[in-house]
């Protein structure tokens, strides 16, 4: 009944399937981009990330690169094959049926971002969280060596 209780975009579409008066009130990604553009440096709203321990990266750089390549293929597949991806999502039990997944996917903003663009986006997100409550990011914004940019 309350969209604030939704855990993800798929939940909005599940609720819409049951109650056609439920609607998407705003697009957080779009609002974030407007707010950051107004401050002179437009960035995306990062809602997920991949993390690797430095020790693992140093010991297995080729495995990390291979994983990232496969991850990019997955992102490209989901964005380029909505119907097939929707069926796979439903088959995995993430949402009750493929129709809900197909309706949700175009609004999920699933992206693959690496390098300096990723670091810039993550830093902007950390800065906002830090300004709101430094404890939310462990008391400090991560240093530049926190980000794996592939360099």
Predicted regions and their residues:
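Short secondary-structure capping/turn micro-motifs that flank functional sites
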Residues: 14, 95, 105, 145-146
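Generic secondary-structure boundary/loop-capping signal
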Residues: 29, 54, 102, 107-109, ...
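Secondary-structure end/capping motifs
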Residues: 57-132
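Pocket-lining segment of extracytoplasmic ligand-binding domains
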Residues: 6-88
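Solvent-exposed, flexible loop/coil residues
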Residues: 36, 109, 114-117, 141, ...
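Conserved C-terminal helix/tail region of periplasmic/extracytoplasmic solute-binding proteins
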Residues: 123-151
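Short, well-ordered junction/capping motifs at the entry into regular secondary structure
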Residues: 2-3
